[in-house]
Amino acid sequence: VELSIDVISDILQFSTFDSKELDKERGVILQEIGMYADEPDSIVADKFDELAYPDQPMGRSILGTSEIIKSISSDEVEGFMKGFYNPKKMVFSVSGNFEEDKIIKLVEEKFQNLPHGDDDYIPKSSYVGGEYRQEKNLEQVKLLLGFEGVDIHSDLYYATRVYSTLLGSGMSSRLFQEIREKRGLVYSIYSSGDFFSDSGIFYVYAGTGHKEVKELIPVLCDQLNINANTFTEEELTKTKAKFKVGILKGEESISTRCRSNASSYLMHNKVRSPDEFISKIDSVQLEDLEKARKKNITILVVTNGA
């Protein structure tokens, strides 16, 4: 444990950014950008974020652009690290067999040279939306329908999670059964959401063929307009059980528990127990699903073909 903390603290506090090494990594990232530019799934995802949050940090690609990567300097990388990697913005998460007092003492000793950085104000993300189409000589069409969703603090957060699972997660979901199994309009379809501290998005992804797109879109919209109260108590109970299994399985993994604790503290300023999450999921009722549907599914904002 002591060696691990020593290595992490050294990386965070005393890293050097040699220009030659930076150029090597620059080349790797440029190749990665080129690789993703050839993947329709990646194009759709990046363009969706860009349209959802234009000219905002939330809408920018994690990889960056080729222009930025080519021009960034060692000083800029070091400045970024000193500005953002500071104690005010960090959580040190430990999970497993350890002595708490010893860990606290080690962290206090080893991280004394962390830069204090700035309390930069990051404005609240503002969802906008739009439309993007890209023609490519491919057999497949990737389509993403996105909506402004709820943030992680919303009263409808848990209901939205359950609704999304019932709607489009797995082979028993409504979208899979109605659109793939019954009509054969897609080879892949699912719904999901991204939940942040100040914003959220809800979306449906579909992979299909050129000939099926025209029929797919109205059928998909019809499914999204169906009242969520048409789900049964049995379906709701099974979905809740699915969440519980996922949570309990995650608890068996030390690394998963470590990441979960860190994320929970960053988002909620406390570590939430699995029992708390399960209790919230259990409290979701059928009428809550319709509230979640109405809140998340409003207007069609993005249609991407690649």
List where the protein language model places each region:
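Charge-rich, well-structured scaffold segments of protease-associated domains
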Residues: 1-118, 133, 150-151, 181-306
